[in-house]
Amino acid sequence: MEVREVPLPATTKLAADYITGAFPAEKGFGYARTDDEAFRRRLIHLQTRTYDRHGLADYLQAYHRRFSASAATMNNIDKLRDENSVVIVGGQQAGLLTGPLYTIYKIITIIRLAKEQEQKLGVPVVPLFWIAGEDHDIAEVDHVYVVEDGEVKKVVYPHKLKEKQMAADVPLDRQLADAWIERVVKTYGETDVTNELLSFLAACLDDSHTFVDFFAAIVLRLFADDGLVVLNAGDASVRPLERRFFAALIDRHRDVTSAVLAQQEALRALGYAPLIEIAPNAANLFYYDGRERSLLHYDEESGLFRNKTGSVALTKQQLLELAEAKPACLSNNVVTRPLMQEYLLPTLAFIAGPGEIAYWAELKEVFALFGMEMPPVVPRLQATLVSRSLQTDLVDIGLEAADVLSGRLEAVKQQWLKATAEAPLTEAFAKAKADIEAAHRPLRELGVAIDRGLEGLVAKNAAIIQAQIEFLQQTLERALLSKHEVEWRKFWRVETSLRPNGAPQERVWNVFYYVNRYGFDFVEKLSAISNPGNGMHKIVYI
């Protein structure tokens, strides 16, 4: 496995500037990405904070027993009881089969940084993945993309949801899930690994009742030897650990919103467009009754916290009582989730994708509201996988993988199409037919002059010659078409693999396509990539 690094700009301007150091870190973050002492200084800060470490470890141990988690994982959970222990954390929604590749890349970055900093700092550093199980946008996680019948297709798990349930509560039907997995894996093609892959996924389903269960079961098995720990943010059993901070968020809901809006204005002044959509009356919490998750806002006129439809209307006191007695009725939004993470976990660093980097910059002042400090934000591994056969295609069309990532493929393809469309066959054969007709005409006239009875013969001879030219033209056209089909398929394969539907590979394809092709140690090999969080895009030749 060969790795080449290229400086590919992030999808958002702020993230791109943060990664390169062009963004003034003090304007949006707690630490500069280039600060070599950031982790050591962050550790000193964490040692001044207190956490409910035993409550957290007790909860996590109970949760992980459901999945028969590895000894390495259970040992890492136990490390959290140590007052000196810290975590490297990153998170994502619970995509089926883990969703796009970037989720796996994020986990790899978490694990690698945890191992690295444990050696450097001499304290226990636990790799933890925050599963966004409280998210209710199931359409973002209910599918994977495959190549089927020569097209990129979205294969959706056939659930029927009428309400905005949390992903942690969305059930998986075993029969439907088995059929869905079989269809997906079938598109990958039969290999020596296929039966092992199907058995692996079936075993994961054995431990799963919901979307989040299935996600957790998969990643805990894939990264069992690395001791990965997961935290399901949609689990009702974690809410008692959060109740005190829910109360703080309710009590200071106006301040939270004001701090975000003020920071957004500060970023606009620097030339950066905010990503978080937040209304002046936002409460930044969701109410959840087990079926419907609805965002709350504060109605100044009535003094009530309401949802959009008005079916929920609570006084501040009622909401505080709910946080204490029934914390499972509350969940965080994009603003408060990072704060709750900071409250629960002694976070040494947060592993972020480009979008997260950009929106976390909008939260700097909110952390300060609660006496918190934003942890160092580290870019996740960004990578593009290139197979040997695909590299051959790239050579044939005269491009490097980096050219495709930087947007050159379309221009080269259009040049090829233009050259193909102007192939001179039609013009050449039209001229040849005219020239042959002009050359044959005097011969016909001479034959008829010698013997008028030869008129039919010379005419037939002319037709035979033209028919042979027509046959040659058709033969060359078929050969040209065949040649172009071969070339066209090269462009198609390159585009489909590296920029499917015009999107980055890591945002479309699923890791199990590659596992089916290269084996389960493929993930282990990816985990060995050097400097996964240095902000450089990795082109991985496999």
From Swiss-Prot:
GO terms for molecular function: ligase activity. Pfam families: CC_BshC, Rossmann-like_BshC. InterPro entries: Bacillithiol_biosynth_BshC (IPR011199), CC_BshC (IPR055399), Rossmann-like_BshC (IPR055398). It comes from the Bacteria. Residues 458-487 form a coiled coil. Its EC number is 6.-.-.-. Keywords: Coiled coil, Ligase. Involved in bacillithiol (BSH) biosynthesis. May catalyze the last step of the pathway, the addition of cysteine to glucosamine malate (GlcN-Mal) to generate BSH. Belongs to the BshC family. This is Putative cysteine ligase BshC. It comes from Geobacillus thermodenitrificans (strain NG80-2).
